[in-house]
Amino acid sequence: MFDVTILTIFPEMFPGFLNYSLAGKALEKKIWNLQVINIRFFAKDRHLTVDHIPYGGGAGMIMRPDVVGDAVDSVLSTHKDTKFIYMTPSGTKFDQSIARELVGFPHITILCGRFEGIDQRVIDEYTPYELSIGDYILSGGEPAAMVILDVCVRLLPGVVNNSGSITEESFSYSGGVLEYPQYTRPKQWRKHRVPKILLSGNHKKISDWRQKQSQVITKRRRPELLDGEINDKFT
């Protein structure tokens, strides 16, 4: 089973959209397990304070290391070999290859930051794997954690009925390029027709056409993928 623990100050956000579609069904079938821990439970005062102003001045608030550290320790006490992940815009950009590596761990822990982030000493103490889902800023790490889990869960055996759906989609198809165009009925819609090659029944020609289209689309939209930048970045 793929076992996941989330550390957050907003536990009510989970499972969120993960409770629907493939991830939700997989959760019901116990293909994966989700535990959510409220970081505020480890606060040191009656107000359940988890943040404070930054030393040296600056905007916003920083999550306290003593509070976050105790929350992390609570997980490590029962999951010593967990893969500890911290969601941060300055982290390694998440991709399909990283997702494939993550599902190989029996347990992962995802720390969701808030405010201006967590005290650097938490990172120095635990050296988490810092991950980002893109070059933009969210209000917190929770939505990013859900994105990562959605990608990972659908890779688990028994989640997607047709394994070909996984192997032929973008970043998995033909060495990590973008997926080829897809068509279904009707054969003609308005002025647009399905390419004749897809109606030919010649599987070799169809496969060649799809590979060529993937290369063309990737070169136009994400040329860096053809230079080998999609690879195993997981450390």
Curated annotation (Swiss-Prot):
Molecular functions per Gene Ontology:
tRNA (guanine(37)-N1)-methyltransferase activity
Does Phosphoprotein count among this protein's keywords? no
Protein name in the entry: tRNA (guanine-N(1)-)-methyltransferase
Q: Where does S-adenosyl-L-methionine bind?
A: G113, I133, G134, D135, Y136, I137, L138
Q: Where in the cell is it found?
A: Cytoplasm
The record's annotation in Gene3D superfamilies points to:
3.40.1280.10, tRNA(m1g37)methyltransferase, domain 2
- A GO CC term attached to the entry: cytosol
Catalysed reactions, as listed in the record: guanosine(37) in tRNA + S-adenosyl-L-methionine = N(1)-methylguanosine(37) in tRNA + S-adenosyl-L-homocysteine + H(+)
Similarity section: Belongs to the RNA methyltransferase TrmD family.
InterPro entries hit by this protein:
Alpha/beta_knot_MTases, tRNA_m1G_MeTrfase_C_sf, tRNA_m1G_MeTrfase_TrmD, tRNA_m1G_MTases_N, tRNA_MeTrfase_TRMD/TRM10
Q: Origin organism of this chain?
A: Wolbachia sp. subsp. Brugia malayi (strain TRS)
Highest taxon above the source species: Bacteria
What does the subunit section of this Swiss-Prot or TrEMBL entry state?
Homodimer.
